[in-house]
Amino acid sequence: MNHFIPRAVLVALLLCPFPPVAAAGQDHGQAAAAVVEVPGARGDRDEKSYRKIFEGMEVFERNRPLAPGATLRFKVLPRRAGVSLQGLTMQLRGAHTRIAIPLDADLSFELPRDAAAAQDDAMVTSNRKAGSLTWRAEIRSPGTPAKTRRLGDLLLECKVGMVADLVAYVPSPVNLLITKLPDPCRTLSINMFYFTERPLFSIALMQGARRVILPAAQLHGPDAPMLTDLQDWYFLRDKAFMMQFKPLYEQGWQDDTLLQFDYMDDDPPGAAL
């Protein structure tokens, strides 16, 4: 069912960050602060509810056709300057749950499907202070070419992120309502934020012979300085881009549409090898 949003609300949404989801291979060299182990009290650490993430896993299972052959992973990125990811650790922790979570080199990870841990009110807990990290779902269909992402993969990341509470947004009654709707990713023209591996220059949508360059306004996020402390994409804005799935699918773009990325540091056409 479609949801009507007044024009004033739509304008507000354009300024609100609804990001999921980061691409693998982010450069973390710019973070130079020393690693600080945070005390274990709930609320002191940067963490997420496993119960909510478990619900997101169920969404992934129900929507597998959007990302054929893909697995569901998660990923963390630095949310602000001075956050070092060296020595980062993750643990699934509850009153009766203690499970270490291995991290890949790009800081992505899988989580077990553990109904008992969800009932235990367990948390996916890092050894970083609250507010240090940006969390995303990570879904990539096998065989996707380098420097591209599939539209269906990104849409499924949005669906999972909404349910799993991995979407950072400016607190407001409207934004809270949106996250509770059955399928806001497809039924509303909301901006979802994603990250690439390197600073972005442009993005092209490609499906067969059809090719369209995304507007520059969809790159690097809107300028809203008063909201920077609430936006989890601002520190990584040179790699950030916004997607609105509803209009794209209404225009006939399909799940297998590719987003092709051109990066700031790519060699110009015709450059000598």
Predicted regions and their residues:
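Bacterial N-terminal signal peptides that target proteins for export
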Residues: M1-V9
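Bacterial N-terminal signal peptides
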Residues: A8-P17
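Signal peptide processing junction and immediate N-terminal pro/mature segment
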Residues: F18-Q26
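N-terminal Sec/ER secretory leader and immediately downstream segment
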Residues: G25-R113
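Extended low-complexity, serine/threonine- and proline-enriched intrinsically disordered segments
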Residues: V76-P102, L181-L227
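Structured domain cores in non-transmembrane regions
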Residues: A81-Y169
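Short, aromatic- and glycine-rich surface loops/edge beta-strands on solvent-exposed regions
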Residues: A117-I139, F241-P269
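Short helix-loop boundary/capping segments
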Residues: R136-R210
